[in-house]
Amino acid sequence: MKHKGMATAALVASMGSAFAQSNVTLYGVADMNIEYANHVGNVPTATNGFNPGPSNNVYRMNSGGWAGSRSGLRGTENLGGGLKSLFVLENGFNLDSGTLQQSGRLFGRQAFVGLAKDGIGQIAFGRQYTSLFDALANFSPTAFATQYEPVVLETGANFREDNTIKYKGQFGPVTAVAHWSFGTGLALPASVGISAPIGGNGEVPGAFRRDTAYGAAVAYSNGPVGVTVAYDQWNPTIGVSSGTMKKAAVGASYSFSDTMRIMGGYRWGQNKNAAGELIQRDDFYWIGATYQVTPALGLALEYNYDDMKNLFGANAPNPWQVSLLANYTLSKRTDLYLSTAYAKNAGLILESLGTFYANSLALGNSYALANGQSNMLGVAMGVRHKF
């Protein structure tokens, strides 16, 4: 009996040790604001003839003005020898209606499992951000804030991709990222320039290339200086074959102090249809700064400009936008914020045919510029709580 008791105690102790090496964290963001925007039209669709409609001023409640509302689980297990397993399950939701974002996915923001090894890096499998998105996120003055950041124009509507293998390694001041998607799981509606829907789930028998995607990035950060270079390619289904959407970008930042940082970058873009014909070619630029006025008050200012060289064979006006975000910290977890932006030759977040109106379709709030208008102004006040 004594030996049996000792064995039982040893088993319990070993189980406690094993459990102590694992952890799971519940986290999330609840973000809500009230917004005013002018010159807003309906999202163009094939059924309305790709017509944004007449001008209207809009007063509305939005979910995710500074950070997308979300909830998630993440965990790791120490496997010994510097090896660990990990997972992330994260959904996005509309706080104003309680509905899911990302086309109703249960875990639409991120869903992956992987392994990480000290000195080698991490490899993960599932729905993940692209290498281009990861690389540029640290060089956005507003940190890709949901409301007025033209993230789709900058990084592509495919900045999250299904069925993805992704590697990330940290080597001193250098970070390397690379990914491959067997099928992005992204579908965009037909537009005035393309009569068929764009994209799909991928993994099509006999058509390996359709809806695949890949990319890579390298970043360097040392002291006040940060630089990055990245590439992304998406091969979406267009009709019965696949097109090619390419993006390459560079970004840089410099911190003058703990309270002030400037950053900017350039992104080259080229989209071709299934026949190899050019449907879009643009050069996108951004510059901005962040300034911590007091321990509680922070500011972020950003300017975006898109040199639209070709859009479905025509010369389109070059859109630009200036935006300002001010946040006031009430605690480590709760903030108040004011955001405003003015866009010219496009809707806010530079929404237009050049983005396939993907922002408006995904968010459910139109920023399509109404007929006969050339600018749009938006102002929003909100609260963000992190848990």
Predicted regions and their residues:
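Transmembrane beta-strands of outer-membrane beta-barrel proteins
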Residues: 24-32, 81, 85-89, 123, ...
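Gram-negative bacterial Sec-dependent N-terminal signal peptides
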Residues: 1-20
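Solvent-exposed loop segments that connect transmembrane elements
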Residues: 38-58, 99-101, 183-212, 234-245, ...
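Outer-membrane beta-barrel architecture
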Residues: 72-74, 112-115, 166-168, 217-219, ...
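Residues that define the transmembrane beta-barrel architecture of outer-membrane proteins
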Residues: 57-69, 106-109, 159-163, 170, ...
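Outer-membrane beta-barrel "beta-signal"
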Residues: 328-330, 371-387
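Outer membrane beta-barrel
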Residues: 21-37, 46, 54-185, 219-223, ...
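Detector for outer-membrane/organellar transmembrane beta-barrel domains
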Residues: 204-329, 340-342
